[in-house]
Amino acid sequence: MSRICQITGKKRMIGNNRSHALNATKRKFLINIQYHRFWIADEKRFIKLHVSTNGMRYIDKKGIETVIRKINMKK
């Protein structure tokens, strides 16, 4: 599975490592992806998502039903 958040769409960023002498080498900044189950009360079932921790905070704030509805509207 690719490291992309299914809620926010966040993915890795590319940047530089900087040594003491300021030499630049490429590196990846990975996001904190968690595989998490969310309970949907309306359907009485769990849904499994690959979500960043920022996406989890968004779900806690808005509610899983609202977020799922918004994702389905984008498709």
From Swiss-Prot:
Gene Ontology cellular-component terms for this entry are: cytosolic large ribosomal subunit
Give the highest taxon in the source lineage: Bacteria
Can you cite a GO biological process for this protein? translation
- Keywords assigned by UniProt, alphabetized: Ribonucleoprotein, Ribosomal protein
Keyword Ribosomal protein found? yes
Entries under InterPro entries matching the protein: Ribosomal_bL28, Ribosomal_bL28/bL31-like_sf, Ribosomal_bL28_bact-type, Ribosomal_bL28_sf
Question: Cross-referenced Pfam families, in alphabetical order?
Answer: Ribosomal_L28 (PF00830)
**What one GO molecular function would you report for this record?**
structural constituent of ribosome
In terms of PANTHER family, this protein maps to:
39S RIBOSOMAL PROTEIN L28, MITOCHONDRIAL, LARGE RIBOSOMAL SUBUNIT PROTEIN BL28M
The record's comment on protein family reads:
Belongs to the bacterial ribosomal protein bL28 family.
Quote the NCBIfam families the UniProt record gives: L28
HAMAP family, alphabetically? Ribosomal_bL28
Official protein name in the record:
Large ribosomal subunit protein bL28
Q: Which source organism?
A: Buchnera aphidicola subsp. Acyrthosiphon pisum (strain APS)
